[in-house]
Amino acid sequence: MENETGSELNQTQLQPRAVVALEYQVVTILLVLIICGLGIVGNIMVVLVVMRTKHMRTPTNCYLVSLAVADLMVLVAAGLPNITDSIYGSWVYGYVGCLCITYLQYLGINASSCSITAFTIERYIAICHPIKAQFLCTFSRAKKIIIFVWAFTSIYCMLWFFLLDLNISTYKDAIVVSCGYKISRNYYSPIYLMDFGVFYVVPMILATVLYGFIARILFLNPIPSDPKENSNMWKNDSTHQNKNLNSKTSNRYFNSTVSSRKQVTKMLAVVVILFALLWMPYRTLVVVNSFLSSPFQENWFLLFCRICIYLNSAINPVIYNLMSQKFRAAFRKLCNCKQKPVEKPANYSVALSYSVIKESDRFSTELDDVTVTDTYLSATKVSFDDTCLASEITFNQS
């Protein structure tokens, strides 16, 4: 990603080529192999978990799959070529590889930023505008938004096809080929600055504002309920005999909904914060170098910037596993490590099904499965207010 300037290359150097320290090569190869290897496995697991587990197919998880694919692209296109560059000290993938690999690098980077922005907006609508969420926070709409995100970033990143070329430096003892720019820094620096603004500054400002609104609703005020459900509770006279039971159960699952939404929001906020922190060194370096006559390219600092980028793309599956019970259980099931549940008498599982006004669309929240005891089983169906839509809980004996 630290492409060199064409004006600085394609020239003959009389002095011998600078030798990269052996410890730098070893550290680079080991760190990149470990981080990228674990990140590739983790992100593939995220995609498989959501695709193979029906209850995991929620709008939020749909955006997380898009983020996982983008992170995979960054790890493969940016991380692995760094290993060959450390080993050979020269670009070995040719002209086509220069174009395609650089294109995939920026496509993954920009798509990950857009995916984070998309799920931030989705969380804001779902929590702060629950009525609108019935129509906006749906799985099919999430898929359409993701298609638009990838189409937009794919077209935008085609710009790099016209800026790149192979640059050759002839030294006294070697010929070094690098994937760099065919134009001077005066022309590509504005592109870097535009990239910095559109895919870093704007998403982070937007995320800060929206998560502020979300925190105010979740942690300072009760979650607003659906007015339709409130009116229906007064209209249904036949349910008055179970009013006390329904009230207790509704409160129980309302609290579960609030707790679950807080946990999911915390998890997504951690993803956004780490994205901002881990991308800051590289983004800052690019901006600073855009104003320097001679760019700062100290090897160890460049390695630090690259490792931060790879960590950002590799760490998200770890966050999901640590902060989401549903992801943790799904990961265990995918790895065939799930232990047999211990049978407990008089415990029942709760199957949550949510109906939306559009029957062809299914919308599900991130509420984790919970268990209830016989105290709450006298009523077959219990209604409670979900923050996004009307909901119904059906109890099935496990």
From Swiss-Prot:
Keyword Ubl conjugation: no
Record's bilayer topology term: Multi-pass membrane protein
Domain of life of the organism encoding this protein: Eukaryota
Signal peptide: none
Cytoplasmic face residues: 52-61, 122-144, 216-266, 320-398
Glycosylation sites: 3, 10
Matches recorded under Pfam families: 7tm_1
GO cellular component term of the entry, any: plasma membrane
Extracellular membrane side: 1-28, 84-99, 169-193, 289-296
Cystines in this chain: 98-179
GO molecular function terms listed in the Swiss-Prot or TrEMBL record: thyrotropin-releasing hormone receptor activity
Keywords for the protein's UniProt record, in alphabetical order: Cell membrane, Disulfide bond, G-protein coupled receptor, Glycoprotein, Membrane, Receptor, Transducer, Transmembrane, Transmembrane helix
Free-text function comment from the UniProt entry: Receptor for thyrotropin-releasing hormone (TRH). Upon ligand binding, this G-protein-coupled receptor triggers activation of the phosphatidylinositol (IP3)-calcium-protein kinase C (PKC) pathway.
Family matches, as PANTHER family: THYROTROPIN-RELEASING HORMONE RECEPTOR
Family label: Belongs to the G-protein coupled receptor 1 family.
Protein name: Thyrotropin-releasing hormone receptor
Organism encoding this protein: Bos taurus
